[in-house]
Each structure stands twice: as C-alpha cells, then as structure tokens.
Amino acid sequence: MFCVAPPELETKMNITKGGLVLFSANSNSSCMELSKKIAERLGVEMGKVQVYQEPNRETRVQIQESVRGKDVFIIQTVSKDVNTTIMELLIMVYACKTSCAKSIIGVIPYFPYSKQCKMRKRGSIVSKLLASMMCKAGLTHLITMDLHQKEIQGFFNIPVDNLRASPFLLQYIQEEIPDYRNAVIVAKSPASAKRAQSFAERLRLGIAVIHGEAQDAESDLVDGRHSPPMVRSVAAIHPSLEIPMLIPKEKPPITVVGDVGGRIAIIVDDIIDDVDSFLAAAETLKERGAYKIFVMATHGLLSSDAPRLIEESAIDEVVVTNTIPHEIQKLQCPKIKTVDISMILSEAIRRIHNGESMSYLFRNIGLDD
C-alpha cells in the first residue's frame, strides 16, 4: 500500500526545498571581493564557511550552515598557489555533497590547468584529470569563462556553461579608447586569429596577424615523443619499406600581415601569462608604425616578472578581467586595467537557480567565438 502526501504538504515541501547558498571556496581576500560583488548583485548574503590550512599544510573546510536540499554555488578564483586552490574547491564540493545539497554548481571563472589540455610528449591531459576529479567530488554543474580550448567542455559529464568576456572587452574599447575607429585588431600568432577576427568584425575594424619566431610556443603542435632507434630483429620493419617523415618546422623571421602604420594596435588573446611573446609583438608593431598599443585578454595570470616587463615595454595598456585576482600586479604596474565581469556571473547564477534558459547570455555568439 502506497502513502500519498496531501497536495498542500507537497507544495510546502517544494517551497522548502528551494533556497540558494553562495560560498567562497578561497580564503584569499581577492576571491572574497568577487564573491561579495556577486552576492550584492543577487541580493543574498554570503554563506558561512571556514577555509583554512592546518599547521601540517592540510586544507580544512568547515561549512557552518545547513545546505540540505539547497542549490549551492561555490565561487573559486585561482590564487598563486593553484594546487591549494583546487583542493579547497574539491573538499568544499564533497562536503556539500555529503551534507545533502540539492545541486552543487562550481563558479570557476578561470579553469586551472586549461593550458594542459593536449597531449605533449609522454605527458598527460591534466585538464581532463581535473574535470574527472571535480565530477567525482560531487559537482553537478560548472560555470566558467573563456576556456582556453572549447573542447575542454567535453571532458566533463555534467553541464558546462562557458561564458564569454568579449562583450565587456568590446565595451571597454568603445568607451575607453576615444579614437578606436583608427585601430586595428592584432592576433599575436596565427593560433589567435579567429579571436582577433571576431573582435574586428564586431567593431568594423581591420585585422593584422603576427607570424614568425615570436609565435606562441603552445601553437606548435609537434607531438614531441622521441624513442631510441629500433633494434634490428626479426620483428623489425622490412628494410625496403621507408615510412615518410614530416619535414622539421622552421619559423620564418617575424612578420606582420596587415597594415598597422599610423594606427592603434589592439592585441587580443584569451590569456596573458608569460608576456615575452606580447612584448616581441609590441616591439614589432612599433617598428611598423603603430603609435599606441593595447593588450586585451580575459584572464590575467601575469606570472613572474610580467608586471615589471610590461611597465618597461612599448605596451601602453593591458586590459584584463577580474576572473583572476591581480591587485598586487596592478600596484607594480599602473598600465594594468581591470574590467569587472561579476554582472554576467551573477545573471548566470540567477538563471540556473530559477531554472531559466541560459541562451540570453549567449546571444550573437558564433562557433568561432
């Protein structure tokens, strides 16, 4: 015999099952800053949680309020210690899972290890490993922004919303660069030409592509595995069969395809980390007659001596979003400017919580964007 709950009780249960909890998974103050901006836009309080490290360097997470039956959104930005950042996220996700959260959505504006999404030599595809770990920990949905390769979405067996920062960067160009009509969009390597083309078509501007030895090493898709010569044996290949080999690559001297003389050059990319290739591109553009040089990217990792090198370079301004904390780098280099993207993250959270369509956030976005 089955027991059916009265309709009025069913309604009450559905209401009590609702509720949104917003956590910051990082003890870093910069992550808290982004989390608070999102919370203010949503009109909710930050969830109560303690994230800290024990004296033995183990990460401990203590959730201090009930998450049972609630939609939990965990915001995590990548700090300097990326591995600790990942452990904080995984432990918090698992804690919410074991506390019977209805759904656990990770808000990770910059997906760590995204550069390691291809097989290199005898290495591994680390971003695939990280995706598997997140799913295993209990993540049910992921919100991220401008994945280094869109194919990373396929590493997950949960829904992934890969938001775009380009509308905010395009708005910055139109509002903060008065004579942007006299600009040309520049791809610092052929690998980033599609992104540059997307910016150029939307701003109705020309495009230039830098090609040559300053090209980003990551675009070199050589597999790189080398083995010792095969020992001659009965099982060895027949001497009359010669397998054709690829001709070794030789990068030409650096060249600019397109006219930048007397114009503003705006270099666009998704990540700015090691700045050597950007500096080489800026020097080349200056030599070709560009009178002002901007660099625009979604994720400003700005590792090592990047702020100092930018400050001493021909680059006039570097514009990045706040997907990654970079307050210290801004103090070291006044040329670095920040665009706030908390608005789109807040709207994504609101829509997912309310069960609304996400298509509004992907308007006019093509396959190449």
Swiss-Prot record:
Recorded GO MF terms: enzyme regulator activity; identical protein binding; magnesium ion binding
Chain's gene name: Prpsap2
GO cellular component annotations of the record: cytoplasm; protein-containing complex; ribose phosphate diphosphokinase complex
Quaternary structure (record): Binds to PRPS1 and PRPS2.
Keyword Coiled coil: no
Domain of life: Eukaryota
GO biological process: 5-phosphoribose 1-diphosphate biosynthetic process; bone development; purine nucleotide biosynthetic process
Tissue: Ubiquitous.
Phosphoserine: residues carrying this PTM: S219, S227, S233
SMART domains named in the record: Pribosyltran_N (SM01400)
Residues with the N-acetylmethionine modification: M1
Function, in words: Seems to play a negative regulatory role in 5-phosphoribose 1-diphosphate synthesis.
InterPro entries, sorted: Pribosyltran_N (IPR029099), PRibTrfase_dom (IPR000836), PRTase-like (IPR029057), Rib-P_diPkinase (IPR005946)
KW Membrane (keyword) present: no
Pfam families found in the cross-reference section: Pribosyl_synth (PF14572), Pribosyltran_N (PF13793)
Coiled coil: none
Keywords linked to the UniProt accession: Acetylation, Nucleotide biosynthesis, Phosphoprotein
Name of the protein in question: Phosphoribosyl pyrophosphate synthase-associated protein 2
Family affiliation: Belongs to the ribose-phosphate pyrophosphokinase family.
